[in-house]
Design a protein with these regions (language model features):
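Secretory targeting and sorting signals
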Residues: 1-27
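Generic detector of low-complexity/intrinsically disordered segments
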Residues: 16-18, 32, 183
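A broad structural signal for alpha-helix termini and local helix breaks/kinks
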Residues: 22, 57-58, 96-97
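Active-site nucleophile-adjacent alpha helix/oxyanion-hole segment immediately C-terminal to the catalytic cysteine
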Residues: 28-74
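Conserved active-site-adjacent core of cysteine acyl-enzyme catalytic domains
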Residues: 54, 65-186
Length: 186
């Protein structure tokens, strides 16, 4: 038996084939549902940021307890208002049973930020103020449509939730990104 398709059948088949080819996907965007904490002491940006990440991962510690874990002190003693590094956050994470992540001496590339957020892992960032001094924050989201990143700032009088272009966050007239923790909890 011989079946013959007419011209209209060929046009329909071509239209269906073109429609079946996947097009460009919409740009991805994702924000993790963190509850960014305000730091309770003037030097505790690192403790507030680390405790924010720990709480996101289901741990229930106060900033004071987080500080004590970081410095190897008795859990409920009064922790001093000390500065710290991301390595100290890693120490606290380890003692909580959270994988401490990877310490990066520098900023993460945009694709690494998206990898972490897509995996459900906030990123800790240390920034350097151009006027002097450092600060810890938490990156918790991105938007590919405009290369935006979202970050939480623990400074009490600042906006808790912020966003900007990735390039702005890496470096601008006010601050630049110097150190990172990725793979926290991996």
């Amino acid at each position: 038996m011989h079946v013959r398709f007419g011209r209209s059948a060929a046009v329909c088949a071509l239209a269906l084939a073109v429609a079946a080819v996947p097009g460009t996907a919409d740009a991805a965007a994702l924000r993790l549902d963190i509850s960014m904490q305000a730091q309770e002491m003037s030097n505790w940006c690192w403790a507030a940021s680390g405790d924010t990440v720990a709480a996101f991962m289901g741990k229930d510690y106060s900033q004071n307890q987080f500080c004590n874990l970081a410095f190897g002190r008795s859990l409920n003693s009064s922790c001093p208002n000390s500065q710290a590094t991301l390595a100290d956050d890693q120490t606290a994470f380890r003692k909580m049973g959270i994988s401490p992540g990877n310490y990066v001496n520098g900023h993460l590339y945009y694709w690494a930020v998206t990898r972490e957020i897509d995996a459900g892992r906030p990123v800790m960032a240390r920034i350097q103020w151009t006027s002097g001094g450092g600060h810890m924050e938490v990156l918790y989201g991105y938007d590919d449509s405009s290369n935006m990143v979202y970050w939480g700032n623990p400074w009490p009088s600042s906006y808790r939730y912020n966003w900007s272009s990735y390039d702005y966050y890496v470096g601008n007239d006010s601050f630049f990104w110097t150190h990172s923790l990725d793979y926290i909890g991996a």
